[in-house]
């Protein structure tokens, strides 16, 4: 029907960005997701009636990565640090119906090789309801079609490594109803 589960998932991420520090439950949600899913199997929980993860399930997977010390937060972002790893989650709701340029600037980094990973979830990547609609919204799904949706309904993932000394800046675009997690972690750090 007309229910936009990706937009709902992005609103949940926005709520977490605004309430970080007051809501301690979110890092544990994905671990206990079975208890959050509807027991009736009607698809009203985090999984579809066929057991496919909805966009909200994927959001909880990204939020689960936000362990650590809160560095900064705003209405559409949250930044945390866990050891030498820095994670910044951005969310762009459909109320802001334009692509927004977002940047992460990390300073005080030790010289070394770092791994930069991005996870992107939105209507074009990771949203099972959007994929289902583009398949033609069949009344029944074959095993192959279910496997295809399960495989494709994952956040887009990108990894790069580079040598950094002192400061690093990452810049990208966040589209409407999209959630973006940027993670900077040391691959090798010089300790002197």
Residue ranges and their predicted role:
Residues 75-130, 134, 177-183:
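Carbohydrate-binding surface patches
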Residues 9, 16-31, 110-148, 153:
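Substrate-binding clefts and catalytic carboxylate motifs of secreted carbohydrate-active enzymes
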Residues 71, 100-107, 114, 157-168, ...:
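Generic detection of short hydrophobic beta-strand segments and adjacent strand-loop junctions
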Residues 139-192:
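C-terminal beta-strand-rich structural cap/linker in extracellular carbohydrate-active enzymes
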Residues 1-99:
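Aromatic/acidic polysaccharide-binding cleft in carbohydrate-active enzymes
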Residues 68-70, 126, 187-192:
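Short, charged low-complexity linker/loop segments at the C-terminal edge of domains
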């Amino acid at each position: 029907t007309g229910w936009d589960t990706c937009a709902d998932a992005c609103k949940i991420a926005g709520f977490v960005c605004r309430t970080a520090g007051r809501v301690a439950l979110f890092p544990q949600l994905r671990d206990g997701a079975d208890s959050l899913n509807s027991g009736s199997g009607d698809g009203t929980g985090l999984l579809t009636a066929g057991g496919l993860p909805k966009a909200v399930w994927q959001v909880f997977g990204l939020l689960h990565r936000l362990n650590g010390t809160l560095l900064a937060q705003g209405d559409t972002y949250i930044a945390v640090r866990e050891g030498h790893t820095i994670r910044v989650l951005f969310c762009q709701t459909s109320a802001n119906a334009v692509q927004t340029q977002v940047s992460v600037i990390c300073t005080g980094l030790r010289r070394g090789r770092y791994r930069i990973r991005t996870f992107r979830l939105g209507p074009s990547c990771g949203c099972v309801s959007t994929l289902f609609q583009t398949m033609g919204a069949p009344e029944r799904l074959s095993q192959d079609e279910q496997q295809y949706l399960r495989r494709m309904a994952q956040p887009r993932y990108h990894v790069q490594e580079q040598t950094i000394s002192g400061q690093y800046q990452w810049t990208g675009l966040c589209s409407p109803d999209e959630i973006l997690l940027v993670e900077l972690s040391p691959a090798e750090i010089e300790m002197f």
